[in-house]
Amino acid sequence: MTTQLSVNVNKIAVLRNSRGGADPDVVQAARACIAAGAHGITVHPRPDQRHIRADDVLALSALTREHGVEFNIEGNPFAPPRGDYPGLLQLCRATRPEQVTLVPDGDGQLTSDHGFDFAQDTVQLAELITAFKRLGSRVSLFVDAGNPDIARAATLGADRIELYTGPYAHAHASGQADTALALFANAAQRASAAGLGINAGHDLSQANLGDFLAAVPGVLEVSIGHALISEALYQGLDASVRAYVDILRSGHVSA
């Protein structure tokens, strides 16, 4: 089975919101990604709506259903509703995405930069996982590769984990990928042994994705946004998506 590509379109919304208009059109960009071979679309709506807004989530849900591809909504399940942000659970009730990825990011974070600490908030997290699964959504938890308690994600009711790959990308760029890859491979093995599916995301790029997939077993899906959109500035959006699809097709999911 080929690892699936879910394109995160947050950066398209960042560019649109910087001018306060409707361009670039997030839905049109997502449609182009799907046409180029993306297997799904990811969004991460935040309470401050600095990029993806609630109305984008509804529109992208309709688009992904029209094209029969996966819709993955990321977000902090503990963030309460405010203003025009109805809360992650309510957005998922309205759209019933195929996958919900829970991320413990705070309002002040520029981007997601750490996974869950399963020593905290486990009871509330388990209750929320149950609520999302009642919607028919697969639930994935954002985790650090070095977390010794990855198997607890299964105990809490999660279906998958998403490995936070920022540290790997940094190590790869500095020529020190081997140690990081060993850590991520071990994390994937521990997750698989616990019955969890494995996703990965954050700072994966055309330069480092192939090495990651060659070393880390069983990666079912990668979520890529910032690098893909950055590369699209030089290559074009269609070509950038196709380049990732080609990398994924050159490998396969190994147990």
Curated annotation (Swiss-Prot):
It catalyses: 3-amino-2-oxopropyl phosphate + 1-deoxy-D-xylulose 5-phosphate = pyridoxine 5'-phosphate + phosphate + 2 H2O + H(+). Disulfide bonds: none annotated. One of its GO terms (molecular function) is pyridoxine 5'-phosphate synthase activity. Its EC number is 2.6.99.2. Coiled coil: none annotated. PANTHER family: PYRIDOXINE 5'-PHOSPHATE SYNTHASE (PTHR30456:SF0). This is Pyridoxine 5'-phosphate synthase. It comes from Xanthomonas axonopodis pv. citri (strain 306).
